[in-house]
Every structure is written in structure tokens, then in C-alpha cells.
Amino acid sequence: MSVPLDETYRYGLMTRLPTAQTTRAITELLDELEFDSIWVGDHIAFTTPILDPFLQLAQVAAYSSRLTVGTGVYLLPMRHPTPVAKQAASLDHLSGGRFIFGVGVGGEFPAEYAACGVPREERGARLSESIAVMRKLWSGEPVYHDGRFFAFPEVHMQPAPVQPGGPRIWCGGRSNAALRRAGRLADG
């Protein structure tokens, strides 16, 4: 079944997929209705069940060969960017280059930052540095980093993402600082 939509528009669904069965059913429905993308959020500790976004989107990518998959948004400042860069590059491979990495600082639930041992007031600066670290790691070349929050010796992350330079990074947020960060560091 096809929904008659203006071909210049793209339609996606931001959803919470609490089970594997729901993920499959929603993915198949979006494919049938010719949606363009599916987006999931991220929280460490939340009031409702939220699965890990990388694992969910890998499942979506296995069920659909055409849907763009994206995070909206991944709370990157709560994590070290090196393993996250590997997860994102892997999802880019599993999706055939259909991954958009939406990131943001969150912060509405301070207990999440406390649970991760990350000072909430550092979240903006950590996000900015994390984006720089991931772009380096996605270059396909040996790189090192010596920054304010993260440092590591020369490493060569392989394989590089399917998308040259890595998945597109979109920054979400509501503050002036978030808008400036998006303009400086993001692809959207």
C-alpha cells in the first residue's frame, strides 16, 4: 500500500520501540507505507522502557533495506566517544550507509548523568569534544587525541564507516549554545 505524498518531502517516525516484536511490526509498516526513516531516542534511566538505540536500529536495518535509521537524540556526553564511534561505524555498515547520528546533551534527568559519573555542567563541552573525536576515528587513518576530557594514543579504527567521513551528525537542542554547536560541528 502506498500513501500519496509529495515526492519532495521525506517522512519519518520518531518512536519508542520497547520490544523486538514491536520493532519488527513498526519497521514493516513503515516500509509498506513508504516512509523514509525511523528514529529512536536514548536514555540510560528513564520513566518508561527504552532499549539501546544502536541495537534497536541494527534490528531495523536488518528488517528494512531502504529506511534511513537515526537517533533522535543520543546522549553522547554521558559516554566515552571511542566505543561510541565504533558502534556508530558498525551501524553505518549494517545499514549500508543509512545511519544518521543525532546527538544532544539531554540533561532533563540529572540522575542519568550522576549514574554515568559525568558532571552535568560539562555536557556541552563533552559533546563538542566527542564529535571531534568521532570524526577523527571515522577518517580511516591512524589518529590520536589529547583533549580536555578524552585522550588516547594512536589508534586505527577499522573498518571506517560506509559514508565517507562517517555518518551524518545532527545536533538536537533548544538552547542558543545547542544552535551554535549545531552550526559549528554538525551536518544538520
Predicted regions and their residues:
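Flexible, glycine-rich active-site loops centered on histidine and acidic residues
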Residues: 1-18, 77-144
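Active-site phosphate/pyrophosphate- and oxyanion-stabilizing loops and adjacent acidic/basic residues
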Residues: 58-61, 89, 132, 180
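Short, acidic/polar
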Residues: 18-30, 83-87, 172-184
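Short, well-ordered coil/turn segments that N-cap beta-strands
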Residues: 5-11, 35-37, 64-69, 95-99, ...
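N-terminal beta1-alpha1-beta2 module of alpha/beta enzyme domains
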Residues: 1-63, 68, 165-167
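Active-site glycine-rich loop that binds ribose-phosphate moieties when present
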Residues: 150-157, 173-177
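Active-site nucleophile and cofactor-binding loops and adjacent substrate-binding regions
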Residues: 47, 71-79
